[in-house]
């Protein structure tokens, strides 16, 4: 008993209780009891236990390192009671990702902050956590979300945090059947008017936009098969941009062809008449220096007082006259033809070239291309004018001869 106490006192080296300098003992220095300080946490009975005799001490919480930081504390120069032992900080675990000491645990970016009532209840429900994660992903604009939503129409009515993709919905079968029936009945003109669209919208309980979109797709997918079953060409009953471009180019080409063909029509009557088999008709139509007015005035009458489509009439007339008719019939027809409206071209032709320039016939704009459905009621009028002109030229030829 005395040996143990002396050993402890030798190891401590000072009767003070606030420090225990290492006086050569290999055991951890613990403060010894002091008779005048009842706050000491160790008693002589504990220090005299058999464990001390064997040179071992039980593990006890260490004293604060601040009390051992100075030499005075190590030497036990003060007899003040030791401060209460501070709470030992928990060992900081190493971060598996960074390999360094991690700080105090913070909530993860995907984890909802806990409320005071949920402190002991564990994490938030899984559904709310997933919704929050999807909302953050949608707000950050990740590439995967953009790639997935390329072929999906933007739904502005739904909230951004829902994260649910709007599935493609099909129209009701009753509504589709009504639209199909209307399409089959009007398959040759499958373009409903605004009133018909409104009526179909009421019958099918769909919006007008849905009806319009359905007809746009049906004309491209359903209508061609319907028309082929009837033996019709789908391109003739549908309007497309490609067909419109083709029709525009064909119309431009036709107009250019007509304009290029106009000079040939203007020159053919003179050459064909001179080349006719009857020499009596070819002689008066040949140009002569004695009567230049009649030769120069004739193109103005034919080209500027009639339509372009009738320019080939003198050519056919000259051929028919050159085959078998004689000039007596032409003279009789010319005498019986007494319309005053046709005397105006005759007067202009009898006068010289100076009067033709003053009358303004040469300044008239060229005629427009003829319509394919144009009425050819003026054909007989042109025939009569040509007969009268031929008779007059025959008389002039006889007088000059």
From Swiss-Prot:
Protein localization: Nucleus
Chief place where the protein resides: nucleus
InterPro entries recorded: HD (IPR001356), Homeodomain-like_sf (IPR009057), KN_HD (IPR008422), TALE_homeobox (IPR050224)
SMART domains recorded: HOX
GO annotation terms (biological process): amacrine cell differentiation; cellular response to growth factor stimulus; determination of left/right symmetry; dorsal/ventral pattern formation; fibroblast proliferation; negative regulation of cell population proliferation; negative regulation of gene expression; negative regulation of retinoic acid receptor signaling pathway
Recorded family membership: Belongs to the TALE/TGIF homeobox family.
Medical condition linked: Holoprosencephaly 4: A structural anomaly of the brain, in which the developing forebrain fails to correctly separate into right and left hemispheres. Holoprosencephaly is genetically heterogeneous and associated with several distinct facies and phenotypic variability.
PANTHER family per the UniProt record, alphabetical: HOMEOBOX PROTEIN TRANSCRIPTION FACTORS
Protein's name in the database: Homeobox protein TGIF1
Organism: Homo sapiens (Human)
């Amino acid at each position: 008993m005395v040996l143990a106490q002396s050993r402890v006192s030798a190891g401590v080296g000072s009767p003070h209780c606030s420090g225990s300098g290492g006086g050569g003992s290999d055991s951890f220095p613990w403060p010894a009891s002091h008779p005048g300080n009842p706050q000491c946490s160790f008693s002589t009975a504990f220090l005299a236990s058999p464990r001390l005799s064997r040179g071992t001490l039980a593990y006890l919480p260490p004293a604060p390192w601040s009390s051992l930081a100075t030499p005075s504390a190590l030497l036990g120069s003060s007899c003040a009671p030791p401060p209460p032992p501070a709470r030992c900080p928990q060992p900081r675990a190493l971060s598996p990702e960074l390999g360094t000491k991690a700080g105090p645990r913070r909530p993860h970016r995907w984890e909802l902050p806990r409320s005071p009532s949920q402190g002991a209840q564990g994490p938030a429900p899984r559904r709310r956590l997933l919704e929050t994660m999807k909302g953050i992903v949608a707000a950050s604009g990740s590439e995967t979300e953009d790639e997935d939503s390329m072929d999906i129409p933007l739904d502005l009515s739904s909230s951004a945090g829902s994260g649910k993709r709007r599935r493609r919905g099909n129209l009701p079968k009753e509504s589709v059947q009504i639209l199909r029936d209307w399409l089959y009945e009007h398959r040759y003109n499958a373009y409903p008017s605004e009133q018909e669209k409104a009526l179909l919208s009421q019958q099918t309980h769909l919006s007008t936009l849905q009806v319009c979109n359905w007809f746009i797709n049906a004309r491209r997918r359903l209508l061609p098969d319907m028309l082929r079953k009837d033996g019709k060409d789908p391109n003739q009953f549908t309007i497309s941009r490609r067909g419109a471009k083709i029709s525009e180019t064909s119309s431009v080409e036709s107009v250019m062809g007509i304009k290029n063909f106009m000079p040939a029509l203007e020159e053919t009557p003179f050459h064909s008449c001179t080349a006719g088999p009857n020499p009596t008709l070819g002689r008066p139509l040949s140009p002569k220096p004695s009567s230049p007015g009649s030769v120069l005035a004739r193109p103005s009458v034919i080209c500027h007082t009639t339509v372009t489509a009738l320019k080939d009439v003198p050519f056919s007339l000259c051929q028919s006259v050159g085959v078998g008719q004689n000039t007596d019939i032409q003279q009789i027809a010319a005498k019986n033809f007494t319309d005053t409206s046709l005397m105006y071209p005759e007067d202009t032709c009898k006068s010289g070239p100076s009067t033709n320039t003053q009358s303004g016939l040469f300044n008239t704009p060229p005629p427009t291309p003829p319509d394919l459905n144009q009425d050819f009621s003026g054909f007989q009028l042109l025939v009569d004018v040509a007969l009268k002109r031929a008779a007059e030229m025959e008389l002039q030829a006889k007088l000059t001869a």
